[in-house]
Protein backbone atom coordinates (compact mmCIF):
# COMPACT_ATOMS: atom_id res chain seq x y z
CA UNK A 1 0.00 0.00 0.00
CA UNK A 2 1.23 3.49 -0.85
CA UNK A 3 1.87 5.80 2.10
CA UNK A 4 -1.13 8.00 2.81
CA UNK A 5 0.54 11.34 3.39
CA UNK A 6 1.11 14.86 2.13
CA UNK A 7 -1.18 17.56 0.78
CA UNK A 8 -4.45 16.13 -0.49
CA UNK A 9 -7.49 17.94 -1.82
CA UNK A 10 -11.08 17.12 -0.92
CA UNK A 11 -11.98 17.93 -4.49
CA UNK A 12 -15.28 19.58 -5.40
CA UNK A 13 -17.64 17.87 -7.82
CA UNK A 14 -18.33 20.31 -10.68
CA UNK A 15 -21.95 20.39 -11.84
CA UNK A 16 -23.67 21.95 -14.81
CA UNK A 17 -27.43 22.15 -15.30
CA UNK A 18 -27.96 19.66 -12.51
CA UNK A 19 -25.57 17.02 -13.84
CA UNK A 20 -22.00 16.16 -12.88
CA UNK A 21 -19.53 17.89 -15.22
CA UNK A 22 -16.88 15.22 -15.79
CA UNK A 23 -14.93 17.35 -18.26
CA UNK A 24 -14.50 20.08 -15.66
CA UNK A 25 -13.56 17.43 -13.08
CA UNK A 26 -10.79 16.14 -15.34
CA UNK A 27 -9.47 19.67 -15.81
CA UNK A 28 -9.56 20.38 -12.07
CA UNK A 29 -7.73 17.13 -11.36
CA UNK A 30 -5.01 17.90 -13.92
CA UNK A 31 -4.57 21.37 -12.41
CA UNK A 32 -4.22 19.88 -8.93
CA UNK A 33 -1.50 17.52 -10.14
CA UNK A 34 0.33 20.36 -11.91
CA UNK A 35 0.26 22.35 -8.65
CA UNK A 36 1.91 19.53 -6.71
CA UNK A 37 -1.04 18.02 -4.86
CA UNK A 38 -0.16 14.60 -3.43
CA UNK A 39 -3.64 13.10 -3.37
CA UNK A 40 -7.14 13.57 -4.75
CA UNK A 41 -10.10 12.73 -2.53
CA UNK A 42 -13.35 12.63 -4.54
CA UNK A 43 -16.90 12.17 -3.21
CA UNK A 44 -16.21 13.42 0.30
CA UNK A 45 -18.08 16.17 2.15
CA UNK A 46 -16.65 18.86 -0.13
CA UNK A 47 -17.39 16.68 -3.15
CA UNK A 48 -21.07 16.39 -2.16
CA UNK A 49 -20.76 12.62 -2.10
CA UNK A 50 -23.95 12.15 -0.08
CA UNK A 51 -26.12 13.78 -2.76
CA UNK A 52 -24.59 11.95 -5.72
CA UNK A 53 -26.36 8.89 -7.09
CA UNK A 54 -24.43 5.58 -6.97
CA UNK A 55 -23.84 5.86 -10.72
CA UNK A 56 -22.57 9.43 -10.37
CA UNK A 57 -20.20 8.44 -7.55
CA UNK A 58 -18.80 5.68 -9.74
CA UNK A 59 -18.36 8.12 -12.65
CA UNK A 60 -16.61 10.70 -10.45
CA UNK A 61 -14.22 8.21 -8.85
CA UNK A 62 -13.48 6.54 -12.19
CA UNK A 63 -12.82 9.90 -13.86
CA UNK A 64 -10.38 10.97 -11.15
CA UNK A 65 -8.52 7.64 -11.22
CA UNK A 66 -8.28 7.64 -15.02
CA UNK A 67 -7.03 11.24 -14.99
CA UNK A 68 -4.49 10.72 -12.21
CA UNK A 69 -2.98 7.59 -13.81
CA UNK A 70 -0.92 6.78 -10.74
CA UNK A 71 0.64 10.22 -10.41
CA UNK A 72 -0.95 10.83 -7.00
CA UNK A 73 -2.99 9.06 -4.38
CA UNK A 74 -6.71 8.62 -4.87
CA UNK A 75 -8.74 8.13 -1.69
CA UNK A 76 -12.38 7.66 -2.66
CA UNK A 77 -15.21 8.82 -0.43
CA UNK A 78 -17.25 5.75 0.46
CA UNK A 79 -19.11 6.35 3.72
CA UNK A 80 -22.68 5.63 4.73
CA UNK A 81 -24.66 5.36 7.94
CA UNK A 82 -25.67 1.85 6.87
CA UNK A 83 -22.79 -0.62 7.16
CA UNK A 84 -23.94 -2.75 4.22
CA UNK A 85 -24.03 0.34 1.99
CA UNK A 86 -20.57 1.42 3.14
CA UNK A 87 -19.27 -2.05 2.30
CA UNK A 88 -20.63 -1.80 -1.24
CA UNK A 89 -19.15 1.68 -1.66
CA UNK A 90 -15.73 0.50 -0.50
CA UNK A 91 -15.95 -2.47 -2.87
CA UNK A 92 -16.65 0.00 -5.68
CA UNK A 93 -13.61 2.11 -4.77
CA UNK A 94 -11.48 -1.03 -4.73
CA UNK A 95 -12.79 -2.27 -8.08
CA UNK A 96 -12.14 1.09 -9.74
CA UNK A 97 -8.51 1.16 -8.59
CA UNK A 98 -8.46 3.70 -5.76
CA UNK A 99 -5.59 3.56 -3.27
CA UNK A 100 -7.91 3.70 -0.26
CA UNK A 101 -11.44 4.60 0.79
CA UNK A 102 -12.48 7.46 3.07
CA UNK A 103 -15.30 6.21 5.31
CA UNK A 104 -17.07 8.74 7.51
CA UNK A 105 -18.45 7.63 10.85
CA UNK A 106 -22.14 6.68 10.58
CA UNK A 107 -24.24 9.81 10.93
CA UNK A 108 -27.76 10.35 12.30
CA UNK A 109 -28.18 6.91 13.94
CA UNK A 110 -25.49 7.73 16.57
CA UNK A 111 -23.84 4.34 17.21
CA UNK A 112 -21.90 3.60 20.40
CA UNK A 113 -18.14 3.11 20.35
CA UNK A 114 -18.78 -0.64 20.09
CA UNK A 115 -21.05 0.00 17.12
CA UNK A 116 -18.38 2.13 15.47
CA UNK A 117 -15.79 -0.58 16.01
CA UNK A 118 -18.04 -3.23 14.50
CA UNK A 119 -18.90 -0.95 11.57
CA UNK A 120 -15.29 -0.52 10.47
CA UNK A 121 -14.38 -4.10 11.34
CA UNK A 122 -17.22 -5.38 9.15
CA UNK A 123 -16.06 -3.20 6.26
CA UNK A 124 -12.52 -4.52 6.56
CA UNK A 125 -13.62 -8.15 6.78
CA UNK A 126 -15.83 -7.76 3.70
CA UNK A 127 -13.38 -5.82 1.52
CA UNK A 128 -9.79 -6.25 2.73
CA UNK A 129 -9.16 -2.75 1.41
CA UNK A 130 -7.38 0.19 3.10
CA UNK A 131 -9.88 2.42 4.88
CA UNK A 132 -9.29 5.90 6.27
CA UNK A 133 -11.84 6.52 9.02
CA UNK A 134 -13.27 10.04 8.91
CA UNK A 135 -14.11 11.58 12.27
CA UNK A 136 -16.13 14.79 12.00
CA UNK A 137 -18.43 15.02 15.04
CA UNK A 138 -19.73 18.47 14.07
CA UNK A 139 -21.50 16.86 11.11
CA UNK A 140 -22.21 13.31 12.30
CA UNK A 141 -23.04 13.81 16.01
CA UNK A 142 -20.79 10.87 16.88
CA UNK A 143 -17.14 10.98 17.96
CA UNK A 144 -14.70 8.17 17.13
CA UNK A 145 -12.63 8.13 20.33
CA UNK A 146 -8.88 7.37 20.50
CA UNK A 147 -9.51 4.11 22.37
CA UNK A 148 -11.71 2.87 19.53
CA UNK A 149 -9.21 4.01 16.92
CA UNK A 150 -6.55 2.02 18.79
CA UNK A 151 -8.77 -1.09 18.74
CA UNK A 152 -9.36 -0.70 15.02
CA UNK A 153 -5.68 -0.15 14.29
CA UNK A 154 -4.70 -3.20 16.34
CA UNK A 155 -7.26 -5.27 14.42
CA UNK A 156 -5.88 -3.99 11.12
CA UNK A 157 -9.29 -2.61 10.19
CA UNK A 158 -8.15 0.93 9.32
CA UNK A 159 -5.13 2.33 7.51
CA UNK A 160 -5.58 5.88 8.72
CA UNK A 161 -7.85 8.51 10.20
CA UNK A 162 -8.97 11.90 8.96
CA UNK A 163 -9.47 13.83 12.19
CA UNK A 164 -11.66 16.93 11.92
CA UNK A 165 -12.08 17.93 15.54
CA UNK A 166 -9.42 20.69 15.49
CA UNK A 167 -8.36 19.32 18.88
CA UNK A 168 -4.61 18.96 19.26
CA UNK A 169 -4.95 17.09 22.55
CA UNK A 170 -6.97 14.53 20.60
CA UNK A 171 -4.11 14.09 18.15
CA UNK A 172 -1.61 13.66 21.00
CA UNK A 173 -3.88 10.99 22.49
CA UNK A 174 -4.14 9.20 19.15
CA UNK A 175 -0.37 9.02 18.74
CA UNK A 176 0.01 7.88 22.34
CA UNK A 177 -2.65 5.15 22.18
CA UNK A 178 -2.26 4.00 18.58
CA UNK A 179 1.43 4.62 17.82
CA UNK A 180 3.21 7.33 15.86
CA UNK A 181 3.33 5.56 12.52
CA UNK A 182 0.88 2.72 13.14
CA UNK A 183 -1.67 4.40 10.86
CA UNK A 184 -1.80 7.56 8.74
CA UNK A 185 -2.94 10.66 10.63
CA UNK A 186 -4.55 13.19 8.29
CA UNK A 187 -5.93 16.56 9.34
CA UNK A 188 -9.44 17.39 8.23
CA UNK A 189 -9.11 21.01 9.32
CA UNK A 190 -7.22 23.56 7.23
CA UNK A 191 -6.93 25.92 10.21
CA UNK A 192 -4.69 23.53 12.16
CA UNK A 193 -2.40 21.92 9.58
CA UNK A 194 0.81 23.11 11.23
CA UNK A 195 0.01 22.09 14.83
CA UNK A 196 -1.55 18.84 13.65
CA UNK A 197 1.59 17.81 11.78
CA UNK A 198 3.73 18.97 14.71
CA UNK A 199 1.71 16.57 16.89
CA UNK A 200 2.49 13.60 14.66
CA UNK A 201 0.22 14.12 11.67
CA UNK A 202 1.24 12.97 8.20
CA UNK A 203 -0.73 15.40 6.07
CA UNK A 204 -4.09 17.00 5.34
CA UNK A 205 -7.23 16.42 3.31
CA UNK A 206 -7.90 20.04 2.48
CA UNK A 207 -10.78 22.24 1.39
CA UNK A 208 -8.73 25.34 0.61
CA UNK A 209 -6.49 23.30 -1.70
CA UNK A 210 -9.34 23.52 -4.21
CA UNK A 211 -8.35 27.16 -4.79
CA UNK A 212 -4.79 27.39 -3.44
CA UNK A 213 -3.24 23.95 -3.97
CA UNK A 214 0.35 25.08 -4.27
CA UNK A 215 0.13 27.16 -1.10
CA UNK A 216 -1.24 24.21 0.84
CA UNK A 217 1.45 21.92 -0.54
CA UNK A 218 4.14 24.40 0.52
CA UNK A 219 2.65 24.61 4.02
CA UNK A 220 2.62 20.83 4.40
CA UNK A 221 6.19 20.50 3.11
CA UNK A 222 7.42 23.20 5.49
CA UNK A 223 5.61 21.68 8.47
CA UNK A 224 6.82 18.14 7.76
CA UNK A 225 10.41 19.27 7.22
CA UNK A 226 10.52 21.07 10.57
CA UNK A 227 10.58 24.60 9.12
CA UNK A 228 8.44 26.00 11.92
CA UNK A 229 8.91 29.68 11.05
CA UNK A 230 8.17 29.12 7.38
CA UNK A 231 5.16 26.93 8.09
CA UNK A 232 3.79 29.40 10.63
CA UNK A 233 4.06 32.25 8.13
CA UNK A 234 2.25 30.18 5.48
CA UNK A 235 -0.48 29.10 7.90
CA UNK A 236 -1.02 32.70 8.99
CA UNK A 237 -1.16 33.94 5.40
CA UNK A 238 -4.00 31.50 4.70
CA UNK A 239 -6.03 32.37 7.79
CA UNK A 240 -8.52 34.81 6.25
CA UNK A 241 -9.03 32.70 3.13
CA UNK A 242 -9.57 29.64 5.32
CA UNK A 243 -12.25 31.47 7.30
CA UNK A 244 -14.04 32.56 4.16
CA UNK A 245 -14.20 28.98 2.88
CA UNK A 246 -16.55 28.37 5.82
CA UNK A 247 -18.46 31.67 5.84
CA UNK A 248 -21.41 29.46 4.91
CA UNK A 249 -21.79 25.69 4.88
CA UNK A 250 -19.04 23.86 3.00
CA UNK A 251 -18.84 23.34 0.03
CA UNK A 252 -20.84 26.44 -0.90
CA UNK A 253 -18.06 29.00 -0.47
CA UNK A 254 -15.30 26.87 -1.97
CA UNK A 255 -17.36 26.03 -5.04
CA UNK A 256 -18.05 29.73 -5.45
CA UNK A 257 -14.30 30.37 -5.14
CA UNK A 258 -13.49 27.75 -7.78
CA UNK A 259 -15.98 29.48 -10.06
CA UNK A 260 -14.33 32.85 -9.40
CA UNK A 261 -11.06 31.32 -10.59
CA UNK A 262 -12.85 30.35 -13.80
CA UNK A 263 -12.08 26.66 -13.32
CA UNK A 264 -15.61 25.27 -12.90
CA UNK A 265 -19.13 26.42 -12.20
CA UNK A 266 -20.23 26.98 -8.63
CA UNK A 267 -23.46 25.02 -8.91
CA UNK A 268 -24.57 23.06 -5.83
CA UNK A 269 -27.09 20.28 -5.43
CA UNK A 270 -30.08 20.71 -3.13
CA UNK A 271 -30.55 20.90 -0.21
CA UNK A 272 -27.43 23.09 -0.45
CA UNK A 273 -28.18 26.56 -1.81
CA UNK A 274 -25.85 29.08 -3.47
CA UNK A 275 -23.98 31.38 -1.11
CA UNK A 276 -25.48 34.81 -0.54
CA UNK A 277 -24.20 37.87 -2.38
CA UNK A 278 -22.75 39.16 0.89
CA UNK A 279 -20.82 35.94 1.46
CA UNK A 280 -19.68 35.83 -2.15
CA UNK A 281 -18.26 39.33 -1.79
CA UNK A 282 -16.31 38.25 1.30
CA UNK A 283 -14.94 35.20 -0.52
CA UNK A 284 -13.90 37.32 -3.50
CA UNK A 285 -12.21 39.90 -1.29
CA UNK A 286 -10.25 37.26 0.62
CA UNK A 287 -9.11 35.63 -2.61
CA UNK A 288 -7.86 38.94 -3.98
CA UNK A 289 -6.01 39.74 -0.75
CA UNK A 290 -4.40 36.31 -0.81
CA UNK A 291 -3.14 37.04 -4.32
CA UNK A 292 -5.28 34.65 -6.33
CA UNK A 293 -5.97 35.66 -9.93
CA UNK A 294 -9.69 35.77 -10.59
CA UNK A 295 -11.24 35.08 -13.98
Curated annotation (Swiss-Prot):
Reactions this protein catalyses: L-aspartate 4-semialdehyde + pyruvate = (2S,4S)-4-hydroxy-2,3,4,5-tetrahydrodipicolinate + H2O + H(+)
Subcellular localization, as worded in the UniProt entry: Cytoplasm
Keyword Metal-binding: no
Enzyme class, first EC level, given as a word: lyase
Keyword terms: Amino-acid biosynthesis, Cytoplasm, Diaminopimelate biosynthesis, Lyase, Lysine biosynthesis, Schiff base
Endpoints of the signal sequence: none
Pathway note: Amino-acid biosynthesis; L-lysine biosynthesis via DAP pathway; (S)-tetrahydrodipicolinate from L-aspartate: step 3/4
Cysteines engaged in disulfide bonds, as pairs: none
Binding residue positions for pyruvate: 46, 205
CDD domains reported in the protein's UniProt record: DHDPS
Function field: Catalyzes the condensation of (S)-aspartate-beta-semialdehyde [(S)-ASA] and pyruvate to 4-hydroxy-tetrahydrodipicolinate (HTPA).
Subunit comment: Homotetramer; dimer of dimers.
Protein name: 4-hydroxy-tetrahydrodipicolinate synthase
Protein species of origin: Anaeromyxobacter dehalogenans (strain 2CP-C)
